[in-house]
Amino acid sequence: MLWEIQLYFSTFDGVINTLMIYKEPIKARRLLQKDGYYFDLCYPQDKRVSNTQAVLWLEKLCKEFNADIVITSTWRKDYELACECLYNSGLSKTIRVIDKTPWLDGYRGAEIDAWLKEHPCPAFVILDDDTDMEPYIDHLVKTDFDTGITVMIYERAKQLLQNQLSK
């Protein structure tokens, strides 16, 4: 099957799960308090991610391009829980999380390559805070670990997809 568009993001951490800081404790969240501030960074067992703004930017991108999500994060060890974390963090149920990449020795680019050989698609973006994406470095929109997906990342990903679709 040829997928119309795939949207990959390789890590939850540094993409949609970033270190969030608050002045006041946030209700129903496990926070680390230090120096008068409250810090939030989630783990899979929290059943959510910390940066709900980044989740909304991801959702907007998916809706705009009718894109699906393939998880390449280490959180994919428990795929169902990883999906639950996304939806619990505000991702609309209309956005499909369709699969995860295989576990291979080496780097993420090889895992994405293995997945693409089984599921070819003409246009995709990799959202990641790392750069081990060969042979798909041209599809990478690199995020900053501390901020994840922002409006600037969204705009870069949008432009990259538009460029791929116009060829």
Please describe what each predicted stretch is.
Residues 1-64:
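Active-site neighborhood of HAD-like aspartate-dependent phosphohydrolases
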Residues 17, 22, 75-76, 114-115:
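Tryptophan-centric aromatic hotspots in well-structured domains and transmembrane helices
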